[in-house]
Every structure is written in C-alpha cells, then in structure tokens.
C-alpha cells in the first residue's frame, strides 16, 4: 500500500460533520452584514510581497517572521496573511473609493507561519470589514454595534467583552514612543531577547507582552491616552458617548495597540475568557493613512477582522445546542423492479418543487435495512420509500426517522402537499 499523504501542519480539513456549524455561522455573518448595507468583495489569496511590507510594516512579526513568500520568475509573491492590505489595493486599483464612500466585507483563508495551537493555525479563515471615506466616529460606533449584533445572533454576546483604546496620530504616537522607551530602558533585565529587540524596533508591541513580570511593570508605564492629540481625543470621547447611548459596555485598555503598523486613532478588540490564552475573537481600528501610503488619495478608513476558527470554538463552548441544520432533510430509498426510475423521478420532483429542502437519493446497493441505516446516519427527518408495490400502485411510503408518527402510505400525486406540512 502506498504511503498516505497528510495535511500540512497547521492547515486543517473541515469534516462533513463540522461543516453545518461553519455554514450556520457564515450565514449569520452574511445576514448581519447585508442588513447593514455592506457589499461583499473577493480578492486573490496571493499578492505582491511589497504590498504587505508597505502596509503592515517591515518590523512587524507578521512581515518579518510569519509570511509564506516565494518567487515567481522575478516577482516576489506572498500568501495573504490578512485581508485589509489586499482590499485597499483592490479599491485603489479599480477606483472603488475615488470620491466615494464604500462599506465592504470579505471572507476567506489567510496564511501565517506560526506555531499551531488551539485557535491559531497556519491557514485560517477570516471575515473582514472595511469602510472607506468616512472620518466621523459614528462609523467606528457602527462597526462595533454591527459586531455586537452578530454576537447576539450567534448566542455568544454574554461571553465577549469589548476593549477600546485610541493610539492617536503618528505624531502623538512618536511622542509616546519616546516616553515609553525611556521608561522601559530601566527594566531591560526583565525582558527576553525578543522583547529587547521590540524595544528598539517596535516598542509599542511590548504593551501586549505575555511576560507576567513585565506586565506588572507596565501598570506604571506612561499611558498612551495621556499623549493624544486633541483631534484623536475628541474622536475617542465621541465614540465612547455613542456606545454609552446605545448601551454597549466596554473597557478602556491603555495597553491595546494591535499588531499592525497601519492603525491610528480608534483600536478595539472583542475578547473572551472561554477560550483560554487565545482570547481575541475580533479586532480592528482606524487606518486613515493606509490608502495614501499605498498610492491612493488620502482616504479615512476603518475596519476589523474576525477569525472563523475561533468563532466556531467559542460557539461550541458556550452555545453547544446551536440549531445547526442537518445536511439532509429527505432520504429516498428504493428496491425492486422499476423502483430505481421511480425513485429518481420522485427525488427530482421534490427538488424542483421544494428547493429549500435537501433531498438525498440512496444511489447504492443494499436491502431496505441497510438503506434505512444509511438514512438514519444522514440525519434526515423523513425517508421516502419506493418498492415494487409502490411502483405498481403509484404510491410512496413516508417513514419518520426522528420519531413522531408511524410510517404511512400516500399517493404520489399528494406527496408534495404532504411534505409542505412537515417542513
């Protein structure tokens, strides 16, 4: 026997038993985003490497350590590690945002070469939302309200907490960076080699360190909110007022900076304690300078991304009885002379007249006992049974597989009307 080939570490398959929950979550996402008037876009999973270096920042962990990059002739390409840069590239290239507001969303796989662990994979799936052309804090609040509405739809709203911060303008961050470095230089004895490197290259990233001793020291560090420019402070205060007005609770986290260099002003995360160390389920913020940085006109922008794998884990943890619909509603079994053709005709009739139902035809050998066993395994609600006598009498037997009434025999001409009463 030939040696089997396994999936790449950190890149996982989704089994038939798992996909109904994924589909249900994705359906809730689509429903909420569509209800807010957002439009779906689709971008390639491969982009030019310089796009991410310019957008995310060359000193970030994502660009310096985690990207899957390769050469195609003389062009360096990368599997996308996140979606914002590609969406901005597409918006500039196709003129979607020239003198225009856009509210966009996308869904798809992303890739990062990280150490796989629960909730963190090398191929993972994200829903991303990007808004272009609106500078007011009202849109910041709308995105947060949108995510909260999604949490309610998923039944997880009591298990997530909103954390907010403002990281201000580039100038304000530069002033804060100097103060933070001055403070941290006296505590390098507590730092790992990686943290010492961050102190030089990207000191704000030390704020989300997992080092417990350094976390205690940071409680007394300068606060970014104390260095905000007036515009950023006013923007943040207005955002908080809007959230207060609609009753969305939040915590101001002065250590929240996000991991990508393009953010400014508002940053936010939805976190949970139900998943252990990997507690962030959604994060985003404003990136008002990114469009211009990538060659477009100056355009105020804001967005967020949420990881579907973590949403799946969270829903399974706190809402295990989620009504994930079975992939099959009706299972058609048949045996005997003439039954095959009759079963095919019946299955197609049901599919044509009741397209909202999922109908599976057995299409395999086996007696009725084996076919019913397969029907039970499919999760179907009903089995439609055709044997030789049913063919001769133009009838069909209906068997309830999930309890309920006993089986009954109906004329074929009445089967559609009957099924409409059952679903």
From Swiss-Prot:
Subcellular location field: Cytoplasm
Pfam families for the chain: HGTP_anticodon (PF03129), tRNA-synt_His (PF13393)
Coiled coil stretches, renumbered: none
One GO MF term: histidine-tRNA ligase activity
Root EC class: ligase
Catalyzed chemical reaction(s): tRNA(His) + L-histidine + ATP = L-histidyl-tRNA(His) + AMP + diphosphate + H(+)
Keywords: Aminoacyl-tRNA synthetase, ATP-binding, Cytoplasm, Ligase, Nucleotide-binding, Protein biosynthesis
Record GO cellular component, one term: cytoplasm
Main location: cytoplasm
One GO BP: histidyl-tRNA aminoacylation
InterPro entries for the chain: aa-tRNA-synth_II, aa-tRNA-synth_II/BPL/LPL, Anticodon-bd, Anticodon-bd_dom_sf, His-tRNA-ligase, HisRS-like_core, HisRS/HisZ, HisRS_anticodon
Keyword match Cell membrane: no
SUPFAM superfamilies recorded: Class II aaRS ABD-related (SSF52954), Class II aaRS and biotin synthetases (SSF55681)
Enzyme Commission number(s) from the entry: 6.1.1.21
UniProt keyword tRNA processing, yes or no: no
Subunit text: Homodimer.
Family statement: Belongs to the class-II aminoacyl-tRNA synthetase family.
Protein name according to UniProt: Histidine--tRNA ligase
Naturally occurring in which organism (per UniProt): Haemophilus influenzae (strain ATCC 51907 / DSM 11121 / KW20 / Rd)
Gene of this entry: hisS
